[in-house]
Regions:
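C-terminal substrate-recognition "lid" of short-chain dehydrogenase/reductases
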Residues: 117, 221-248
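Short C-terminal tail/terminal secondary-structure segment
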Residues: 94, 145, 237-256
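Active-site helix of classical SDR
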Residues: 120, 156, 164
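Substrate-binding pocket helix/loop in short-chain dehydrogenase/reductase
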Residues: 81, 95-97, 104-109, 213
Length: 256
């Protein structure tokens, strides 16, 4: 598939998965704009894309802050962004719900749900006016299979699936396609943190926590960043896909 001539905006662009998305989309021909809160992380990701022969600009933005998103939209007003990848997300606490502080709950929803709403609100109008565009929201398999001791995160991803389906119905008739991608546990720094916190909570070893997560998948393993990125590109090559969610979890499906 070619994305030549299209501009893709990726939130959470300084993280490992954002970087993988950038590499895959640039390889498909897209111009990439990486958005995130960490300037150095964004610069490192942009350099990686450039080394692979792609093009990636960066812009600092806090997607949970309406003013920051408004400034970003004004900054990129002439960029003709036709692909929005809402990848920014926070993992939140690893504790039973009764031990979660209200501020921790709010922090998770501020990025994982409110951030997606704010980005869509800012960048959908030009797509609607042009009669074309794609939005891919990065959800999680935990939005379909509850993850114990991760209630804020699980609830936020369930909310994101609902947002995706509803928004697809609103803007699909205007030529804009909205879908979501639900990875399982992706190998990398975020899951390493989750394994450590799970081990501390349950009293097991970090290695045992990782084995437990992997055992929940039919393939018995975690998902790799490049697998998720390739799935994103594949989704964009399916013109009939709208209001859908693609599960990329190595078979970590919801129990019957």
């Amino acid at each position: 598939m070619t994305l030549s001539g299209r501009t893709a905006l990726i939130t959470g662009g300084g993280g490992p998965l954002g970087r993988a998305f950038a590499l895959a989309l640039a390889d498909a021909g897209a111009r990439v704009i990486l958005v995130g809160r960490g300037e150095q992380a964004l610069a490192d990701a942009s350099d990686r894309v450039a080394k692979e022969g792609g093009e990636a600009r960066t812009a600092v933005c806090d997607v949970s802050d309406p003013d920051s998103v408004t400034r970003l939209a004004a900054q990129l007003a002439d960029e003709d962004v036709s692909l929005l990848v809402n990848n920014a997300g926070v993992a939140g606490p690893v504790r039973p719900l009764v031990d979660v502080e209200p501020g921790e709950w709010d922090d998770v929803f501020a990025v994982n749900v409110r951030g997606v709403y704010l980005m869509c609100r800012a960048f959908l109008p030009p797509m609607i006016a042009a009669g074309r565009g794609d939005v891919v929201n990065v959800a999680s398999v935990s939005g379909k299979r509850p993850l114990l001791n991760r209630t804020p995160y699980t609830a936020s991803k369930m909310a994101l699936l609902g947002l995706t389906r509803t928004l697809a119905g609103e803007v699909g008739p205007r030529g804009v396609v909205v879908n979501s991608l639900s990875p399982g546990p992706v190998r990398g720094p975020r899951m390493d943190r989750n394994f450590r916190l799970t081990a501390e909570l349950t009293g097991c070893t970090v290695e045992a926590a990782e084995r437990d997560f992997a055992s929940r998948a039919a393939l018995g393993r975690l998902v790799e960043e490049d697998e998720v990125a390739r799935a994103l590109v594949a989704m964009l090559a399916m013109p009939g896909l709208c209001g859908a969610d693609i599960d990329l979890s190595a078979g970590m499906i919801a129990p019957a």
